[in-house]
Amino acid sequence: MLRGWLRLLLDVVFPATCEGCDTTLPAGHPSCLCDACKAALGRAEGSLCERCGVPVASDSPCAACRTRPPAFGRARAAGWYVSGSVLASAVQSLKYRRRRHVADALGAHLAAHYPFPTDVVLVPVPLHPARLRARGFNQALLLARALGRRCGLPVASRALVRRRATRAQPGLDAAERRRNLRHAFRVRTPGAVAGRRVVLVDDVLTTGATADACARALLVAGAMRVDVYTVGRAP
């Protein structure tokens, strides 16, 4: 009870602001997003490629997935990651402003849009140790934990590791991204994923190259199937 009163007092003295639009939140507001921004997070829907989730004319696989099927079974996102959108602002606040609590709101948004089977294990996309030290946390792990709490699912936080540093992906085409990520990941604890259905968790899916490389490593380690779920998807 004392903790609750203390939180209310802090909200009055140091009012929280919405991570989507920077407006002041009411004291005791249960989320880091105002109601308008929560509603504006949106959903990635419409006719989507049945494999990678990119917008297509019909729900059949897109040309890229027909030409080179990804290792993962299915990729879906909670919303479209578009510059200037509430979702993009919230993700950037988490990653670059180090607002770790934003992961709870984004994890809840993802959980609200997809029914996750109870027999899956969540695996976050790992950061290289140098990047992890620089940032101080792995946003994919925070999202996986938030999703796990919401859905009652286990998180294999150390199952997948990034074995080498890679070039930054922006600016690389699809073929360059695949080469950049070749053999970049390995499964450190195969027992955590062998014979299991795995849900790979990350903040944003762009070309799917990172998800594909992770899925290949997980399948080699014995995972039965790998699906990918992210907060945002580049359209």
PLM region spans:
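Glycine-rich phosphate/pyrophosphate-handling loop used in enzymes and phosphotransfer proteins
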Residues: 1-235
